[in-house]
């Protein structure tokens, strides 16, 4: 909330909306960049340094143009749901099937004409109110309903394929199950199947989202279970006897 992201998220007539995933993930990736920058500096100077990291600031930078708009124009952007200040149509549209959606974004009049052609030029696409982008913005709510009257007849994947083939920005909104079965994600091996004594034999974890051509990343083992390396650390690294370690375990000091 203190990053400003919640205040920007939601619909104009609704309250600020909390993002449903943990921001710690973004903070972790941002910290990784800071660590790498410090290591590069150490290679050149031979000196290490402390990193003063702010989780809040790592999220605030996601606001992008909203921060720039205020810095340059003194204008505070407000919540606008899925609407965009420039692109229209710009929304998530219901598709065939239960809770299936597709995101469509039209950036200019040329893309609008491509969309109209791709969906068969139904009568409403010839309405003068939708001919120009500035006019489409004024009537965007009605336009959204009309676009959805077409998307509802197809699956989200079908809509994506039809519109992308016409050069229109469209992508199926995927749920967690879709992510695991998506052909593109499978081809990239975005999820790796691991074996874990607690999670089971087919426990999938996300692989790094970057692919290096010369030194590819790999996940070679599952995460350790709680206490898995207690005896190794205490005996091999701290030089305690197995009897001492066992006593500490019995006393509840270790596990």
Give a label for each model feature.
Residues 1-101, 105-106:
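Active-site-adjacent "lid/gating" segments in soluble enzymes
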Residues 26-30, 84, 88, 106-110, ...:
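Conserved active-site and cofactor/substrate-binding residues in soluble primary-metabolism enzymes
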Residues 48-56, 162, 245-249:
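Beta-strand segments within the central parallel beta-sheet cores of soluble alpha/beta enzyme folds
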Residues 89-166, 170:
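Aromatic-enriched alpha-helical interface/lid elements that frame and gate functional surfaces
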Residues 126-138, 174-183, 243-255:
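Short linear loop/turn motifs
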Residues 131, 199-247:
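Flexible, small-/acidic-enriched active-site or ligand-binding loops
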Residues 165-220:
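A glycine-rich dinucleotide-binding beta-alpha-beta segment and adjacent secondary-structure elements
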């Amino acid at each position: 909330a203190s990053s400003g992201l919640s205040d920007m998220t939601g619909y104009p007539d609704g309250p600020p909306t909390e993002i449903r995933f943990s921001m710690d993930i973004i903070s972790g990736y941002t910290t990784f960049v800071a660590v790498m920058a410090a290591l590069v500096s150490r290679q050149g100077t031979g000196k290490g340094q402390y990193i003063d990291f702010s989780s809040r600031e790592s999220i605030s930078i996601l606001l992008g143009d909203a921060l720039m708009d205020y810095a340059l124009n003194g204008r505070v952007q407000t919540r606008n749901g899925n609407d965009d200040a420039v692109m229209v149509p710009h929304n998530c549209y219901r598709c065939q099937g239960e809770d299936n959606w597709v995101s469509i974004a039209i950036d200019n009049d040329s893309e609008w004409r491509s969309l109209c052609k791709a969906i068969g030029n139904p009568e409403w696409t010839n309405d003068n109110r939708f001919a120009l982008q500035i006019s489409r913005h004024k009537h965007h709510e009605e336009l959204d309903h009309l676009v959805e009257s077409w998307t509802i007849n197809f699956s989200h994947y079908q809509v994506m394929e039809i519109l992308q083939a016409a050069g229109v920005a469209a992508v199926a909104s995927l749920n967690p199950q879709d992510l695991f079965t998506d052909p593109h994600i499978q081809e990239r091996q975005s999820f790796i199947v691991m074996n874990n004594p607690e999670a089971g034999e087919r426990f999938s974890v996300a692989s790094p989202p970057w692919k290096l051509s010369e030194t590819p990343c790999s996940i070679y083992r599952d995460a350790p279970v709680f206490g898995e390396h207690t005896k190794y650390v205490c005996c091999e690294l701290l030089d305690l006897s197995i009897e001492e370690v066992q006593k500490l375990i019995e006393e509840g000091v270790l596990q």
